[in-house]
Amino acid sequence: MTDNNDTWTVAGRTFTSRLIVGTGKYKDFEQNAAAVEASGAEIVTVAVRRVNVSDPKAPMLTDYIDPKKITYLPNTAGCFTAEDAIRTLRLAREAGGWDLVKLEVLGEARTLYPNMIETIRATEVLAKEGFLPMVYCVDDPIAAKQLEDAGAVAVMPLGAPIGSGLGIQNKVTVRLIVEGAKVPVLVDAGVGTASEAAVAMELGCDGVLMNTAIAEAKDPIRMARAMKLAVQAGRDAYLAGRMPTRKYADPSSPLAGLI
């Protein structure tokens, strides 16, 4: 059973669930809210440019997912320059008072890989303005350290391209990021199914963020529940410490004293 005292902290805020879920691609707000509940997530990430969180004349996500119970993490999805991302998060802070934010500055529409030069520049500006940026980045330990130095409160390397469902393509570099970071590390993007979420946690990550894997499942609510259990299982496996790998067999029962 997962230890309820096994919490994680980002920017002075402590959480029990290590699964962060998105709010895009769902059939409607009702389904989104049900998936969040099934996942056990305490944080949801919201695309400021796409999801209504401030216009009371239109359906609002906050009517379905209570911001008093769930932490909202505004993100800059769809931004391709540092200026766009900074402006978007300034608007988010004006609308809802949010300072803990998710920064992503994309390099191109085909791969949705981050533009790290623009990302680092935006991180520096946002940190100076009092934001607490959790930052989407490439799976590169050097880039992750640069982001940390620039003021990132968490680094979020991609496992694979956003929405691809390809799973974690480079376990070695993700592990290196975990080993070198002094801030939380969360895999962001690429997870497609529960086993891949477990892998992220087994690598020592502090958490996993996902959207498409749940929203595009045939049964999003069931998948949300599966992801919750997978993240817990992966974390427990990491804390337990896996057995060493061996070249040859090692019998489970002693060979001495056989009849």
Curated annotation (Swiss-Prot):
Subcellular location: Cytoplasm
Chain residues that bind 1-deoxy-D-xylulose 5-phosphate: 163, 189-190, 211-212
Active site per UniProt: 102 (schiff-base intermediate with dxp)
A GO CC term attached to the entry: cytoplasm
Catalytic activity: [ThiS sulfur-carrier protein]-C-terminal-Gly-aminoethanethioate + 2-iminoacetate + 1-deoxy-D-xylulose 5-phosphate = [ThiS sulfur-carrier protein]-C-terminal Gly-Gly + 2-[(2R,5Z)-2-carboxy-4-methylthiazol-5(2H)-ylidene]ethyl phosphate + 2 H2O + H(+)
InterPro entries in UniProt: Aldolase_TIM, Thiazole_synthase_ThiG, ThiG
EC number: 2.8.1.10
Keyword terms of this UniProt record: Cytoplasm, Schiff base, Thiamine biosynthesis, Transferase
Coarse class of the protein's main subcellular location: cytoplasm
Gene3D superfamilies membership: Aldolase class I
Keyword Repeat found: no
Annotated Pfam families: ThiG
Any GO molecular function: thiazole synthase activity
Pathway in which the depicted protein is active: Cofactor biosynthesis; thiamine diphosphate biosynthesis
Family, similarity comment: Belongs to the ThiG family.
Subunit relationships: Homotetramer. Forms heterodimers with either ThiH or ThiS.
Described purpose of this protein according to its UniProt entry: Catalyzes the rearrangement of 1-deoxy-D-xylulose 5-phosphate (DXP) to produce the thiazole phosphate moiety of thiamine. Sulfur is provided by the thiocarboxylate moiety of the carrier protein ThiS. In vitro, sulfur can be provided by H(2)S.
Name under which the protein is recorded: Thiazole synthase
Gene that this sequence comes from: thiG
